């Protein structure tokens, strides 16, 4: 049995713009989560081609300890809180799988994303069979809705309801921004449809951990896309060549940061 949710994130940018914005923001957010022996280690970042699909393959290791809830830390053996993330980015479709060597086949997180030029109105964009699709909970994330943000995560300079882009003049996003976007032919629009499938097979803990992970994924998607929009002036003029160069630099920075300093970034809100 697995727990499946589809998160829909509407943004006032084009699918083409988002490709650069997403990669820029991933690199920046990785730095904010790395330090003191924890965080993100990039093993591979290279082009791939398989079965007619072309894109960028990444393999990252997440060193987590303080970033999981206390009830998991209590039962997790030393060294088991290391997770492997493999991602195939054949934009506008992306697939990410997170595994753990200690739990082997009893655990995975799979995130499949389609980026579409609409306002999140497409149904079953991932083409699931009807019986599976009936079990999927759809969650709409509004990047301008402060009530969807954990109080500890809130930053005024990463609030789309307050931010206005100098370069694009987009923002601030009011309470009815999605309706306004639908009626504004001049402003681009898109939706990230993120299908998250979670398996955690551990007697007595399965539903608690699966629900915790889904809650954390929503938190990550919400914070990440708020940042992405508020950082638009930093990435809107970048090319994919700029991004690849930045990723190489970030990979080296992360290695240094992880080995030094104190633990940084998001910690687990216990459930």
Curated annotation (Swiss-Prot):
UniProt superkingdom: Eukaryota
Does the entry feature the keyword Transcription regulation, yes or no?
no
Q: Which residues carry this modification: Phosphoserine?
A: 262
Q: Which GO terms describe its biological process?
A: lipid metabolic process; nucleus organization; phospholipid transport; retrograde vesicle-mediated transport, Golgi to endoplasmic reticulum
Q: Which InterPro entries match?
A: PI_transfer, PI_transfer_N, START-like_dom_sf
Q: Which GO terms describe its molecular function?
A: phosphatidylcholine binding; phosphatidylcholine transfer activity; phosphatidylcholine transporter activity; phosphatidylinositol binding; phosphatidylinositol transfer activity; sphingomyelin transfer activity
Q: Which Pfam families match?
A: IP_trans
> What stretches pass through the bilayer?
none
What's known about how it's activated or inhibited?
A: Phosphatidylinositol transfer activity is inhibited by N-ethylmaleimide.
Please give the annotated consequence of changing residue 187 to A: No effect on phosphatidylinositol transfer activity
Name of the featured protein: Phosphatidylinositol transfer protein beta isoform
> What is the species listed in this Swiss-Prot or TrEMBL entry?
Homo sapiens (Human)
């Amino acid at each position: 049995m697995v727990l499946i949710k589809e998160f829909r994130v509407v943004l006032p940018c084009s699918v083409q713009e988002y490709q650069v914005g997403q990669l820029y923001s991933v690199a920046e957010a990785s730095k904010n989560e790395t330090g003191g022996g924890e965080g993100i280690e990039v093993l591979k970042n290279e082009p791939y081609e398989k079965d007619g699909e072309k894109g960028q393959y990444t393999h990252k290791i997440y060193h987590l300890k303080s970033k999981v809830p206390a009830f998991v830390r209590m039962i997790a053996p030393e060294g088991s809180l290391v997770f492997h993330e493999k991602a195939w980015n054949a934009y506008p479709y992306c697939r990410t799988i997170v595994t753990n060597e200690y739990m082997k086949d009893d655990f995975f997180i799979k995130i499949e994303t389609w980026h579409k030029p609409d306002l999140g109105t497409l149904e079953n964009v991932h083409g699931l069979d009807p019986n599976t699709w009936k079990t999927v909970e759809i969650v709409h994330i509004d990047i301008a809705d402060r009530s969807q943000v954990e109080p500890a995560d809130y930053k005024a300079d990463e609030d789309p309801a307050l931010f206005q882009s100098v370069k694009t003049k987009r923002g601030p996003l009011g309470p009815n921004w999605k309706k306004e976007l639908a009626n504004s032919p001049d402003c681009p629009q898109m939706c990230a449809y993120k299908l998250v499938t979670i398996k955690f097979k551990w007697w007595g803990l399965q539903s608690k951990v699966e629900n915790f992970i889904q809650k954390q994924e929503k938190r990550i998607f919400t914070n990440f896309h708020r940042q992405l929009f508020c950082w638009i002036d930093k990435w809107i003029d970048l090319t994919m060549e700029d991004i690849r160069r930045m990723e190489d630099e970030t990979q080296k920075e992360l290695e240094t940061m992880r080995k030094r300093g104190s633990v940084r970034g998001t910690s687990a809100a216990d459930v």
